[in-house]
């Protein structure tokens, strides 16, 4: 991928990677101080201290009751700390503008992802809401800005589960009835469920969505029949891989 991208700048990539590594080392020293001076500095910042020997990287977990499986970046075996890392940009941090809905700098998709991970731990281990220190780490930025404490927002967690259930139900319906029954729903207006009309959406997101969806509505009858048949087959295969299939049935 990098060899064929004319925009790729290896020097900048190397510099950015070194900065990320430096920031990560600082975060480790804050959460898991190795010396007395580091521990004092963390305490001065109001940071809780955690046992480095209990830290585990990228543990995988599954919760059948919630229908969630995932892999978090860092946690401790005593379930006192949960950290999800994001290496990309966060414009809230760069512009010093908090999210108006949450009064903090985290981005909602990342917040939702972390809440779902925490929901699994809470359900599987019967944890109280104040048992786990939940953190989002934007490692592109120094820890003072990028290491964020986030709260367990139960309303947002329930909304995420509800939205996931709606997606699953829609996927089952399309797989059963055929993709042609949903083709007309693939428009920017329908997909923009939040009704966003800000500059970023109209300048960047909407053109990308239109580039994908607009050709779907200009297909010839033969092209549409082939495309819908293929999409139905692919979706059914995906559903079978996730939930299994009854013996004796097929996806043809």
What are these regions (language model features)?
Residues 2-13, 140-152, 211-217:
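Charged, low-complexity surface segments at secondary-structure and domain boundaries
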Residues 31-38, 121-124, 167-174:
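Solvent-exposed amphipathic alpha-helical surface segments
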Residues 155-252:
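Accessory, charged alpha-helical segments in nucleic-acid-processing enzymes
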Residues 40-45, 81-82, 86-89, 245-252:
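Acidic/polar, low-complexity linker and loop regions
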Residues 1-79:
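Metal-dependent nuclease catalytic cores that hydrolyze phosphodiester bonds in DNA/RNA
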Residues 21, 32-33, 46, 96, ...:
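Short, flexible coil/linker elements and helix-boundary hinge sites characteristic
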Residues 50-164:
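Mg2+/Mn2+-dependent nuclease catalytic core
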Residues 8, 12-23, 148-158, 203, ...:
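Alpha-helix boundary/N-cap detector
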